[in-house]
Amino acid sequence: MSGTIIKVSGPLVVAEGLGDANVSDVVRVGPDRLIGEILNMTGDSASIQVYEETSGLGPGAEVESTGMPMSVELGPGMLENIYDGIQRPLPEIRELTGATISRGTDVPALNRTKKWTFVPVAHEGDELTGGDVIGTVQETSAILHKIMVPPTLSGRLISIKGGDFTVTETVAVLEDKKGEKHELTMMQKWPVRISRPYASKSMPTRPMNSGQRIIDTLFPIAKGGTAAVPGPFGSGKTVVQHQLAKWSDVDIVIYIGCGERGNEMTDVLMEFPELTDPRNGEPLMKRTVLIANTSDMPVAAREASIYTGITIAEYFRDMGYDVAVLADSTSRWAEALREMSGRLEEMPGEEGYPAYLASRIAQFYERAGVVECLGSDERRGSVTAIGAVSPPGGDISEPVSQATMRIVKVFWALDSSLAYARHFPAINWLTSYSPYVDTLAKWYNEQFGPEYMINRDKAMHILQEENELQEIVRLVGQDALSPADRLTMETAKMLREDFLQQNAFVDEDAYSSYDKQFELMRMILTFDALGRDALGKGADMKALFSIGAKERIGRAKMASPDSYKQEYASILEQMKTEIDAVIAGGEDA
């Protein structure tokens, strides 16, 4: 079915003669066959969002509808790959057209010639339903790719064969109840705007270990949770996202560079192959899918890139994997929505954003969660969605930040003053929050006993108390404080500098296990408890603050994963001995 262009306005093209087309259908526009998607229909005229540069297009050019919605190809070959916002593989396009992507380039998302070794796990005669695993492919050394029956099919398996196949070759044949035969390949297609089905959704109960102490201990996120990372320019949103992509204890990471600088994607491409996953020793790239829709690419494709990423994540979730989707930045996506809304002459909402901004943001985040996967075997997978928000001037009262805060659970507020003070991660512990603290308390209690959560609450109380005392210090100076308040200020400083602050460039400190975090915080709070006891017995405050063990606590976070337990036990022993000596010295005086 084809129509004719009657209007071109930037990325928006209006064509007539498409009365039989549907909203969300993919179309080919003009002589270069640019990729577009129908946004709305009025009679036989269609408003089309074109995902490529439209210069040179004009009225009279032909538009052809494919009759298919915007879909992604799901199968072996996605991991370690880098796609643009509409799932075109950038390495293969570079081989075809060079560094600049030619308009209308049409390359399949999955390599059609590469052969994968398919190992059947289902047997002929098995009754299968949507989501059942029929075989596996060792896609990378870190990930076993499970080939599943598409969610819409069910029936009896009448043939299956193992061996080396391309993604389009038939590996099995399924006969449904009507007697129709369906050939199954290793590849599925799925519309990006429709979430993949699952059996049931459940409450997130396991934390996602990010290796970042301020996140894991103070503001944890659960696997299957949602989080926002808002902050002004230069406060470290992308660096936080990179750290999460590197060290999170998930099986697969989908990193969406949506409208941000190309150098940030380059950093990922250069660093990830060099870094190893702390859980299995494999290069991090083996578990990563990159979607690059950088600031110099067409704005319209940003809108698709978020949906492309979350659909790929749902596919891996259906295999029973824990997946993290990192979107950097959802603000650029919202700006793409605003531009298209303006071109469509829709009624603008606050600050020119469309009135449906909040519902679109909700559609993205609600696809996160912990699910019981479809299929007869019990599989549980999760999608954790973490979106960066870039409010102009760092003003989180703007519509994108506000809509995001109403939807997501965890809020890691980045602070430019902390970033400029070289405090990384620059997450403000006074304005951030996480409702998952109560949900995950049971898990922490089972792993570490009640002391973990008690220590967390004590640390938060000390940091909040320090904030109140700083007002007095600014007015009358530190000498006006009581010895107990001086100790609170000193402990808070230790918590800030020796616990919350991390060095992303030192291997020993870039990632902290839960146990190391627990022991480090316990050591700082033990100093606080012993110090209060010593001050009550008349110990000299200056002598207390200058003990050798306190200096060793400052270096304790750099202890290696193999030796930190012995190191921390030695520091605690030294601390008790030195504080006893300070008390004895105070009593003698």
Predicted regions and their residues:
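Short histidine-centered loop motifs in beta-beta connectors
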Residues: V50, S55, F118-E127, R156-T166
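C-terminal amphipathic alpha-helical interaction region
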Residues: L535-A589
